[in-house]
């Protein structure tokens, strides 16, 4: 565990609620867009820029996951983690993709597209919006001193996993000194620093507490097990009060 991740203070205090609770009021939630990227991938700079463009939409939460399998080609990605590569491999199976690759966009855990296929990405967003069902509600509340309470409630279509993705919001520049992008000041958008499993969930109510490191934000992801569809998301910022 790196010193950065060990600085992340989090507390999973799941409080099991009743087996069945009323569904929350129907409302549109953001769609989670994940980009699997690498600082060593020559096609990824353009995809990183497009991820930032997508995040300008009010109906999108965008995250950049750096995979580590490009690290053997001369440059070690400063954000890559094996856990992010494993997440992409789960999507490979659940979405029936022939191989892992970069840049790959995954839309709400339900569809994927290559980074240059912007029309396919936009179509997937539209399809997901049309097919989205209410049933899972994620709420976050800042409680001061950087602490947050996270509440998950409702009835997911299937047994689910709850994850906390901790990311550095906005644009970040990394000077690439080797590999296929050598000499490039590469722009990264919302790069993820940690992906933490909070637990399994089959419905009802669950509550967690989390504290984020300074300069980071968090996204709660509720999705089907083993890389299944996303059922709920909630974004929150580091609070310094």
Each language-model region and where it sits:
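Short, conserved sequence motifs used for protein processing/export or organelle targeting and
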Residues: 78-98, 111-241
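Sec-dependent signal peptide recognition
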Residues: 1-10
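Conserved residues at the C-terminal ends of beta-strands
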Residues: 108
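Active-site-proximal cofactor/substrate-binding loop regions of enzyme domains
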Residues: 10, 16-99
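An N-terminal domain-start capping segment
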Residues: 13-15, 121-122
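Ligand-binding face of N-terminal immunoglobulin V-set domains in extracellular IgSF glycoproteins
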Residues: 105
């Amino acid at each position: 565990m790196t010193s950065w991740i060990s600085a992340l203070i989090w507390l999973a205090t799941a409080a099991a609620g009743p087996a069945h609770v009323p569904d929350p009021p129907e409302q549109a939630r953001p769609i989670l867009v994940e980009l699997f990227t690498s600082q060593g991938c020559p096609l990824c700079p353009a995809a990183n820029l497009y991820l930032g463009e997508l995040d300008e939409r009010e109906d999108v939460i965008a995250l950049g996951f750096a995979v580590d399998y490009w690290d053997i080609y001369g440059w070690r990605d400063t954000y890559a983690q094996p856990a992010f590569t494993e997440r992409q491999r789960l999507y490979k199976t659940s979405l029936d993709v022939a191989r892992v690759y970069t840049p790959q966009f995954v839309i709400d855990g339900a569809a994927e597209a290559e980074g240059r296929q912007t029309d396919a990405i936009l179509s997937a967003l539209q399809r997901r919006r049309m097919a989205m069902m209410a049933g899972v509600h994620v709420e976050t509340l800042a409680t001061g001193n950087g602490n947050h309470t996270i509440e998950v409630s409702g009835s997911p279509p299937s047994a689910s996993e709850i994850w906390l993705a901790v990311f550095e919001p906005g644009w970040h520049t990394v000077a690439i000194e080797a590999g296929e992008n050598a000499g490039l000041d590469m722009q990264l958008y919302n790069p993820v620093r940690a992906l933490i499993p909070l637990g399994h969930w089959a419905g009802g109510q669950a509550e967690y507490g989390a504290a984020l490191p300074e300069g980071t934000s968090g996204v709660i992801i509720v999705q089907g097990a083993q890389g299944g569809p996303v059922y709920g998301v909630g974004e929150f910022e580091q609070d310094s009060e």
